[in-house]
């Protein structure tokens, strides 16, 4: 198994990339996607994998320096694990073999020789220069039948200038075990980079665009908004506070002398390798006009109900309808205060709230941090793994 080094992605892939797989990282214009391959390379050599890097656009020293500046990864510390074909090697092969067929044979011989001599586990290929010379299919075919006595994983990076339609046409002819499409400014939330698991041959996963940010050269998968909504005093503020590593709420004393949220709760946490922002909406009816704005671009909705107050189900249904709007997003129902005496059943909740089949319903106590975290873990799975 080859780990990508991105915890959320490795989790989605159920551990990483199986040995012997072919992976394609297709980067669309303006997407900040080159760090995926850099992180993969660094993770591989740290774990002792012998790696061949084919970078026809630069020298080995310049490549190492550039990565150290971008990501603070010092690959020179693992020099004995990294074989390299650099710009001067590429130019020499082309110069000495002006005929394309002999050039192709020279490339294949050189790659096979390094793989066998150095016991290579992983090949990192920057494909653009090779595809300009041999075309895409011809460049990829250089890595057929490597003659190794062990499975060799190959990760290609390719700048896809023509979008998903072009990518689909390529993949109809050339199969890969893993295809990750890296995009900018599309999907559920604008102004973020997105990665889409286009193909995962060993798993059944929906093709879904998930945001990520790049900070100091490192990939951070990101869920910018999960909304927690529900009637007043259903436990939203307690829930958000209990799951958050940092956050704030805007509240004042209600008629019963207890704090009641009049604006929103904001929390931040990490789950399954994702950085997550949590927004709790006010439950009072007079704030309904602002709830759609608070819920705009949410990637998931947690609907909280008080199981000791079945009379509030109609209000909960109204809030669910407002938050969902016309968008189809995953919903989880949290039946809070399950540590107290109550009589409402899961079936009654499902009927009253008109929730879709398969929607999880969790009976919890919002003061129990472990139970609250389990709800967020489930929401991450709903967002990333399941059809909705």
Regions found by a protein language model. Name each.
Residues 7-9, 16-58, 235-237:
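Glycine-rich P-loop/Walker A and Walker A-like loops and their local beta1-loop-alpha1 context
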Residues 341-388:
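Canonical P-loop GTPase G-domain recognition
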Residues 254-286:
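Switch I (G2) and immediately adjacent beta-strands of P-loop GTPase domains
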Residues 218-257, 272:
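Conserved G1/Walker A P-loop phosphate-binding module
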Residues 287-309, 322-326:
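Inter-motif core of Ras-like GTPase G domains
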Residues 89-148, 286, 297:
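Phosphate-binding/switch loop-helix module in NTP-utilizing enzymes
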Residues 160, 182-184, 306-307, 332-344, ...:
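G-domain G4 guanine-recognition motif of GTPases
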